[in-house]
Amino acid sequence: GFDTWNQQALLAPPPEANCGTNDDYGTAVAISGDTAVFGAQSDDVGINANQGSAYILERNAGGPDNWGVVKLLTASDGGPDEFFGGSVAISGDKVIIGASNDTIGAATQRGSAYIYERNNGGPDKWGEVKKIVALDGAEDDLFGSSVSISNNIVVVGAIYSGGPGLGNGAAYVFSQNAGGGNNWGQIKKLVAPDGADSDLFGISVAISGDSVVIGATEADVSADGQGAAYVFERSLGGPSNWG
């Protein structure tokens, strides 16, 4: 017969999370083994409205199958209206959090993403390792719209990359040791070969091993805004070419 899936827990914000009105706890969620990550993109951090935060929960923290909060993550350089936590992903002991509205220099809404590791700074400290941005990023790209991680490779979507406000969209691939140990350097920019304005390529991304899939919800195929998804392979077209 079919497997039966029953609800085990309601993961509402626990008291220790200090969630407030309109924090948007659960904006994005991800899980790996017994560790889960929840984004709260509209969380006010200090005096910064809508800076955003993310919570790490462990299955047996506070008791068997309790799913207790073990860490609150915020951007080390966070500011207002960055929406940190709008996208989250986890793979083993690594977490990545998107902040698509982050202002970089004078470029508003250029966007960024932050990588954390479980034991960075000490056992279970979940310390920030690196803030990553697109090398060719520009205002209104919304880099960090989506994130995914598999082992030592990260993929980040930027839905408006490629033009002022209405770009085709792009996704960026980063490798943990590109440019040095734990440097998380950019190794590839992925774009749709048939992309057009407002396709929103990069609105969703996923990676598993050597394969990446990118969503483009507004791509015109046989009808306007029908949507499409694009699959890329690491070694298609050459080693680490991501064709």
Predicted regions located by residue number:
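Conserved beta-strand/short-helix segments
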Residues: G1-G243
